[in-house]
């Protein structure tokens, strides 16, 4: 009954009536004067709290972020996170409706009994730019003589201070002696410009035009494309071939054009988008009605269609396919409630999160989404370094169909569109458990205006099965539950919604889970069933998942940039390959299991396909556990999933996409730390002609032995469509892990006792 005040129809009317009469017999007083009363339900919901009524216990439960409150009508106390709190004014009932004092929210939720949110006394140097700082950066940039009217903003984000200084702050509390600085990326027409702005001294430190770069697709480009399509008489005429007479019912999806060395007939220096379209039939799912074999090429500078590419006319699939369940009667499901009656086990201080032995900083970036920084683990009082920064590096969704409406489709979702900008607000109780704390985040829009995204990130703790268990005959059972802290973020890029979870285990493991849901991009075909004459040809590149609709085979490939600092920055990549070796020690066995251990000493050697039967470690060979083993973290790019694993790029080596985006084909990369090397696809991948990302970073083959190394893991799935994913796709996951390997001296959760 969250988000609503409801009373069960069970026969408790007499008890409730008595409570109502007793509670409203006379005026209610607070501090010697008559209290001003307001409706509990409306007031608390406007505050953002869930309101629940327990008809049996005659009690309200109020939940807001870290506060879990129980209060009975007429009672002089409430229970807040398991502790008693005196109420200046009790909850009263009148005519079946609950009323509270207008000071109730302050009395209860500002009582200090909820310790989830703490005041940040020393701002973390990696805190996101505030709304005021974003506005200041824009003001400074606009005052520059080089700034041109109508310039748009691709990104306004924190320019990070020196890494060593940030670690000194996180570990010793040493203040960072540097002004707050912003990176500003702009689009002046089709020209990309980078600026670095000193916010404290209100001056521009650098102003750099970037030659040959194509900027991101911005949100107003979507509006421009729709207007161009709607007002084009040429496009309207072509639509008639497809039986469409009203261009106003056509929904466009602007897509980047890729790079084909001129074989697609497109001018390389132009700012172009390809547009595929769908018909809005009124069923709420225009994705089910593709206008197949029709592509408009739009010049964003000229604001016009410069080319229309066509194939054979395929009738638009017209069968209604709503995905919101409007035409289904699903069975009613009883509530499943997750409660934390004594409050949260974690605290949030500014943007720093503390849970169990973990501490980390969290901020949202407009391109890659959440960035987790200064990740440490408290090992018996010693704060140990694990990771300086971890984030999505980039991702790509390439399709395998060569037809006119598909051959160019290879979506670089973060690099071309900005996945942080496309953050989807999280709905508590649906997108995240009901016990989640939702965090708002502020980024800049394309005009430079600060924009706050409500519920951008969810934080929650969950039960995750037994941490360990053993039952010895004749002795008591020994077991404890596993808890996980999840940082969840969702980005909606066109038809797909991507869920990213950073999962902290109390045993030192970090999970990275990438989930894909939403609606598949589908192709209109002639075949209704696999028995139709055209079915074999229609399904050459995909699966018939509905009448006249094929789900085209594609991949979801994710890359994560993980600047691991395992007990410090001098790390080495170590391989351990379990092998079968002959038995030379005697006895009946002819073979043994042994481990071949060796160092991988350079960037080129580190770029590898992942073999799940082997072990790859980032080790600090100068630090040992008590047995003398070097402390390490295991890197597992693919630890399971629900779709076939993407073991590499499903493209021939002579494809341009293969050469532009090397990160797709190998699951493990390790490079030397350089602060400007942040994106596996390169900083400006839109229409890039060669690899400016990981392939370039590793080209100089720097040494990795006892250096500050950055791990990049590529994971994902090859998506072969099935009927059960249409018209909306259940979330499909790819899982990765970072796992302590001789990092500790013993089972790190030994002796844990959880209530």
Curated annotation (Swiss-Prot):
Cofactor: Cu cation; Zn(2+); Ca(2+); L-topaquinone
EC number of the protein: 1.4.3.21
Active site as annotated: 413, 496
Reactions mediated catalytically: a primary methyl amine + O2 + H2O = an aldehyde + H2O2 + NH4(+)
List of residues binding substrate: 411-422, 493-498
Modification after translation: Topaquinone (TPQ) is generated by copper-dependent autoxidation of a specific tyrosyl residue.
Binding positions (Ca(2+) 2): 603, 697, 700, 702
Binding site residues for Cu cation: 554, 556, 719
Keywords: Catecholamine metabolism, Copper, Manganese, Metal-binding, Oxidoreductase, Periplasm, Signal, TPQ
EC primary class: oxidoreductase
A Pfam family reported for this protein in Swiss-Prot or TrEMBL: Cu_amine_oxidN1
Positions of Mn(2+) binding: 563, 565, 708
Signal sequence, renumbered to the chain: 1-30
Modified residues (2',4',5'-topaquinone): 496
InterPro entries according to UniProt: Cu_Am_Ox_Cu-bd (IPR049947), Cu_Am_ox_TPQ-bd (IPR049948), Cu_amine_oxidase (IPR000269), Cu_amine_oxidase-like_N (IPR012854), Cu_amine_oxidase_C (IPR015798), Cu_amine_oxidase_C_sf (IPR036460), Cu_amine_oxidase_N-reg (IPR016182), Cu_amine_oxidase_N2 (IPR015800)
PANTHER family: AMINE OXIDASE (PTHR10638:SF41), COPPER AMINE OXIDASE (PTHR10638)
Complex formation: Homodimer.
Protein name: Primary amine oxidase
Species for this entry: Klebsiella aerogenes
